[in-house]
């Protein structure tokens, strides 16, 4: 009764009663002597009713009551399998029995369906039924594969065989459902495994993997799977994932290398494995014996341990008596750390793989035969079709199938490599036919570019979605593909080598794959050992193969991707450029959107896209990506399992640490206490590596070298004592490695592009266009902010002007002198600072080109235009803008805002703008380095032409050319009489003549070439020429000094011999007394400058340049003077001449003083005007340069044009003009001389 009560509590009584009645009505054993099973009268209907109960009660209500009742009634083993025996293989025409058999499988498939429930979704009913149903399914599998009366699996295939034999075009949906039903039944039988942590009833070998493989082989299920797989895509389409699942549950956790070895080799390997395990056990027991209990352990032991600081510590236990190291470990173990309680970490290990599987010899041979046949005939069609189904996200392809697909691809690729290796061991020489059959073409379906794209997509998506199980499978697949391709490259077949070369180039081409693999290894954290093993194996294989491939292909190119900006109107801009080119316009005139506007309020809506770029691959730089502390921690976590790792896994970790410490020379990354302690324990710790292992020596040497480098580095960098406790970051690593901080470089952001208008328009139209662009781009907030700033500036400027007017009114009654001084001291209006209200506005002021254009149009400018602009640069409104002008600007903005301008061509306001060229931008920046006058002079405002060099230029002629210059000057002086003939000519005619002469001279100057300034011999020196130059200068200076002394003596003056003694000379006194003698001052300064340069340099070339400069300046200053009457002049002109009267208000013209009638005396007297010598230096400042270099050029052109035009006229006597009052050429003139 107690059992009945319990059952009644678990399952509803009415449900149990209905199920029990249906099972009883299904049939039973006969009372005859044979004891065979007899069907009930309505057995087919009963089976259909049972299927409905399972579907509409258990599945709809999410309960398991019906399955629990059927398990307790032993429906499968007691009824359904017995019913299938009534349909023997010889009876192929009985449709009724075939329908009965199909109905039996329709009930068995849901009963054997895998029970997969999420723990969060499970109910109390699920917790009650699941353990019982899992054991019941294990009983179903035992009964099915061990049923002796009839092969149940083969019978299932017989049920679906008529539907399979039909062509795919003639199959009905019912035929498709029957085929899938049978395949699901085979999948369920292969998938059922003993539940973990539950003790099973009966012999587990009857439901083991070996028993399952034997049943599939004996009942010809392998042949069925091979037939379906080889015809996948032709006769079968939606059955691909189900067949893949069946194969997955047959081969998972089976070592492929164990399939393709002989029995003798397998026994030897098992013996070695057993011996290794026994050595590990002995080492473990040896370490335990030091602390294990003895026969006297029942007697308590307590000792006192005196520490270094003098404190006493109590330690209990006999193991404390062994040695000091044991006592210290005992004290450390007594320290308890109570971490905060956290939620239980989810199980990261893959649930569908299970523990490793060991097959018996019979099952191993059967599975080996199936794998070989599958590789030869069914691998390419099946996995090609499955990949296509997964890529197109077919309805029958679930998420779990992705992981199974990549796992199986990796498993079969490894099996193919093991098969080729076994054949190479059997026979070193392979026949041509065998090589053709066993070619890598058998696995070509997973070595295509589409497969690589699917892997990259799955790798990236699983990493982003944190699907660790799928990511583990993809990493396994990647590793096996790399190993397979590497083996292909080592094949003697040239075709395989070429395919391997192309495959490796495609695998290594994408730099995103490189980065993703490095990130996977760097971000490991509690994903389980399977994930850890797959990640470390991928990194090891990837680095090793890539290193070898990069050495063979030094010109390896990879495609890197970077972030870039793309405008929404890029297509429109391209079309505009094309139309402009077709029309013959400049491409610069087309409104192309700017690409440097990174502000959110910029030109167009932008979105980031990936722009690819090929670059040369450098393995050294790439390997650094696998040296950060995260990747090191991943391999350290893997190495901590060193007692459970095989030789291949230990070698993998050893090679990585060796690469980091010695190849990359980043051993500083391994200098951490836990890492050093791990290396020490692996060699000399309480549980070290097996000394008979081939990897022990390598690990011992590696640990020794790393510890040695660590000790040496501690001596060089004492700071490492502290850093031993922490992980190393980039800056810390650089400092510990080199002894100084890593320099940091920063980049300065660039301001927005400068825009200009395509057509010259008025200021109001320009403001209208700029305002319209901001409105079109929905940036009205910038426009409103600018108006607010202008309004505030207008109010402030108006207040300042009112105060200024009030102050001016209070000073009206003051004296004129005081008022003038006050007006002169009155400061200009202060500038107004433009302040952004938000950081976004500040960024827009720096990056938004249209806002910057409008700010410049309204008169705003930067406070420091000579410095490079930054986002923090200050903008101001200069004081030159009045309140009225600011108000007019605001009115223009308001007008453009409410009445935007329209254009004839129907274009937008943005089309009226274009970007300034690079040259224009450079000119704009250069304008800040010169003041306005220098710019105007440089551009030559006086003339329309710019000349880079003066006409003529210095020559290397000797002084014998000077008489020619004398005659020219004489002719110019005598030509002054021609002015009398021009008195009757109008000013317009004179201006026209002068213009023609200027144009003629400009034409001559254009023909001058720059080579007259630069010669190959400019850098050469001539000692003889220098000697002659200094001798000539010495004689010239003596002549001038004598002339000067004689002139001063005639006037009764004396020259002071000591100029620097503190007294002024007579010449200096004359100059100081007459500030208006401009000509004498200019001549003195010119001569002083020329003598200073000649003495300092001593080169003839500089002297000639100074002489040329003097002659040009003389020609500028010698202008025709007007005739004036002089009654008291001490010297009279040779021939009097009448000059036109000087216009009132003009300055006095410089006159020419004749000291002699002959040309030689005239020249010498002119030279005598130069007072400055090598021993006499004046302290006056040099005369300032002309404000515009073009002014001097224009005067020279006018003068030369006038001289050129007067050459044909008759020579006239030189007329002596009225002498300049007070001083001229050193002569002191009394005031009475002017009368």
UniProtKB/Swiss-Prot annotation:
Keyword 4Fe-4S belongs to the record: no
Keyword Nucleus listed: yes
Disordered: annotated span: 327-357, 584-610, 812-841, 897-1235
Keywords carried by this UniProt record: Cell cycle, DNA damage, DNA repair, DNA replication inhibitor, Meiosis, Nucleus
Top-rank taxon: Eukaryota
Residue ranges, compositional bias (Basic residues): 964-973, 1124-1150
This protein's name: Topoisomerase 1-associated factor 1
Disulfide partners: none
Biased composition (Basic and acidic residues): 999-1044, 1193-1202
GO cellular component: replication fork protection complex
């Amino acid at each position: 009764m107690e059992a009945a009560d319990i059952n009644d509590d678990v399952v509803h009584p009415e449900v149990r009663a209905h199920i029990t009645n249906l099972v009883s009505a299904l049939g039973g054993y006969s009372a005859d002597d044979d004891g065979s099973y007899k069907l009930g009268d309505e057995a087919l209907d009963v089976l259909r009713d049972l299927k409905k109960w399972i579907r509409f009660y258990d599945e709809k209500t999410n309960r398991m009551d019906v399955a629990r009742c059927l398990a307790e009634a032993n429906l499968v083993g007691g009824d359904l399998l017995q019913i299938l025996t009534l349909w023997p293989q010889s009876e192929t025409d009985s449709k009724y029995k075939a329908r009965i058999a199909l109905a039996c499988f329709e009930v068995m498939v849901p009963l054997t369906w895998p029970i997969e429930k999420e723990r969060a979704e499970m109910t109390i009913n699920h917790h009650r039924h699941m353990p019982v149903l899992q054991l019941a399914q294990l009983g179903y599998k035992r009964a099915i594969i061990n049923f002796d009366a009839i092969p149940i699996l083969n019978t299932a295939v017989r049920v679906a065989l008529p539907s399979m034999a039909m062509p795919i075009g003639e199959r009905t949906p019912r035929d498709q459902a029957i085929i899938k039903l049978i395949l699901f039944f085979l999948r369920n039988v292969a998938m059922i495994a003993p539940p973990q942590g539950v003790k099973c009833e009966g012999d587990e070998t009857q439901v083991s993997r070996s028993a399952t493989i034997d049943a599939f082989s004996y009942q010809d299920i392998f042949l069925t799977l091979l037939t379906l797989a080889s015809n996948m895509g032709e006769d079968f389409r939606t059955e691909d994932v189900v067949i893949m699942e069946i194969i997955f549950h047959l081969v998972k956790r089976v070592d492929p290398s164990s399939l393709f070895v002989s029995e003798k080799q397998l026994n030897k390997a098992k013996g070695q494995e057993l011996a290794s395990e026994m050595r590990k056990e002995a080492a473990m027991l040896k370490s335990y014996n030091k602390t294990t209990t003895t026969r006297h352990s029942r007697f308590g032991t307590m000792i006192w341990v005196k520490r270094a600081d003098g404190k006493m510590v109590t330690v209990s236990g006999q193991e404390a008596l062994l040695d000091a190291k044991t006592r210290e470990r005992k004290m450390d173990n007594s320290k308890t750390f109570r971490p905060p309680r956290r939620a239980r970490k989810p199980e990261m290990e893959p649930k569908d793989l299970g523990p490793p599987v060991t097959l018996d010899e019979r099952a191993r041979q059967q599975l080996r035969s199936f794998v070989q046949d599958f590789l030869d005939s069914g691998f390419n069609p099946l996995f090609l079709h499955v990949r296509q189904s997964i890529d197109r996200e077919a309805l029958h392809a679930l998420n779990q199938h992705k992981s199974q697909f990549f796992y199986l691809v990796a498993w079969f690729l490894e099996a193919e490599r093991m098969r080729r290796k076994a054949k190479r061991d059997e026979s070193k020489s392979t026949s041509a036919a065998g090589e053709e059959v066993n070619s890598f073409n058998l696995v070509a379906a997973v070595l295509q570019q589409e497969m690589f794209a699917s892997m990259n997509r799955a790798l990236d998506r699983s990493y982003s979605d944190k699907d660790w199980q799928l990511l583990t499978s993809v990493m396994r697949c990647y590793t096996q593909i790399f190993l397979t391709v590497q083996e292909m490259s080592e094949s003697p077949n040239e075709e395989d080598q070429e395919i391997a070369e192309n495959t490796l180039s495609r695998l290594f081409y994408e730099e995103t794959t490189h980065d993703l693999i490095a990130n996977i290894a760097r971000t490991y954290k509690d994903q389980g050992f399977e994930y850890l093993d797959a990640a470390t194996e991928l990194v090891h294989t990837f680095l090793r193969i890539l290193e070898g491939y990069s050495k063979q292909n030094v010109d390896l190119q990879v495609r890197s991707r970077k972030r870039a900006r793309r405008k929404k109107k890029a297509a429109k801009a391209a079309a505009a450029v094309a139309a402009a080119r077709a029309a013959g316009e400049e491409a610069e005139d087309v409104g192309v959107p700017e690409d440097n506007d990174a502000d959110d309020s910029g030109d167009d809506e932008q979105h980031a896209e990936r722009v690819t770029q090929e670059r040369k691959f450098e393995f050294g730089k790439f390997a650094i990506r696998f040296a950060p502390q995260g990747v090191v921690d991943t391999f350290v976590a893997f190495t901590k399992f060193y007692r459970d790792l095989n030789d291949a896994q230990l070698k993998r970790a050893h090679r990585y640490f060796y690469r980091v410490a010695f190849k990359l020379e980043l051993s500083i990354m391994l200098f951490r206490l836990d890492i050093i302690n791990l290396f020490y324990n692996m060699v000399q710790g309480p549980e070290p590596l097996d000394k008979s292992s081939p990897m022990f020596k390598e690990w011992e040497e590696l640990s020794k070298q790393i510890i040695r480098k660590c000790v040496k580095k501690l001596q060089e960098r004492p700071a490492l004592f502290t850093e031993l406790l922490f992980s190393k970051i980039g800056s810390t690593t650089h400092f510990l490695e080199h002894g100084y901080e890593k320099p940091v470089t920063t980049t300065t952001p660039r301001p927005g592009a400068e825009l200009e208008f395509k057509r010259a328009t008025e200021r109001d139209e320009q403001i209208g266009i700029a305002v319209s662009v901001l409105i079109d781009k929905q940036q009205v907030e910038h426009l409103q902010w600018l108006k607010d700033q202008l309004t505030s500036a207008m109010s402030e400027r108006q207040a300042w002007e009112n105060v200024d007017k009030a102050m001016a009114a209070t000073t009206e009654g003051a004296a004129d002198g005081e008022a003038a001084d006050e007006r002169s001291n009155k400061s200009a209006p202060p500038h107004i600072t433009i302040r952004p209200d938000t950081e976004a506005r500040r960024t827009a002021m720096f990056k938004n080109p249209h806002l910057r254009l409008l700010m410049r149009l309204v008169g705003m400018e930067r406070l420091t235009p000579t410095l490079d602009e930054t986002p923090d640069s200050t903008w101001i409104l200069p004081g030159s803008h009045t309140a009225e002008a600011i108000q007019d600007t605001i009115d223009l903005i308001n007008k453009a805002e409410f009445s935007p301008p329209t254009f004839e061509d129907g274009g937008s306001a943005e089309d009226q703008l274009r970007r300034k060229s690079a040259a224009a931008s450079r000119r704009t920046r250069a304008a800040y380095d010169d003041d306005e006058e220098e710019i105007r002079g440089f551009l030559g405002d006086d003339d329309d032409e710019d000349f880079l060099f003066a006409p003529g230029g210095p020559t290397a002629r000797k002084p014998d050319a000077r008489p020619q210059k004398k005659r020219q000057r004489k002719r110019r002086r005598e030509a002054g009489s021609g002015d009398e003939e021009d008195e009757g000519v109008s000013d317009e005619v004179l201006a026209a003549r002068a213009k023609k002469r200027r144009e003629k001279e400009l034409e001559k100057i254009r023909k001058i070439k720059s080579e007259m300034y630069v010669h190959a011999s400019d850098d050469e020196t001539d000692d003889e020429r220098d000697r002659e130059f200094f001798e000539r200068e010495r004689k010239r200076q003596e002549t001038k000094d004598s002339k000067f002394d004689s002139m001063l003596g005639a006037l009764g003056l004396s020259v002071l011999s000591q100029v620097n003694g503190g007294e002024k000379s007579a010449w200096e006194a004359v100059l100081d007394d007459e500030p208006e003698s401009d000509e004498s001052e200019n001549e003195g300064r010119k001569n002083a400058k020329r003598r200073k340069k000649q003495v300092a340099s001593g080169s003839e070339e500089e002297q000639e340049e100074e002489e040329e400069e003097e002659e040009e300046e003389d020609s500028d200053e010698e202008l025709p003077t007007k005739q004036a009457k002089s009654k008291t002049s001490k010297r009279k002109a040779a021939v009097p001449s009448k000059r036109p009267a000087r216009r009132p208000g003009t300055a006095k013209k410089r006159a020419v003083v004749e000291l002699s009638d002959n040309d030689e005396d005239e020249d010498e007297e002119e030279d005598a005007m130069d007072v400055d010598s090598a021993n006499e230096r004046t302290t006056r400042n040099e005369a300032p340069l002309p404000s515009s270099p073009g002014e001097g050029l224009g005067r020279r052109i006018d003068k030369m044009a006038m001289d050129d035009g007067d050459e044909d006229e008759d020579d006239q006597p030189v007329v002596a003009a009225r002498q300049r009052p007070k001083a001229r050429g050193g002569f002191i003139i009394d005031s009475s001389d002017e009368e």
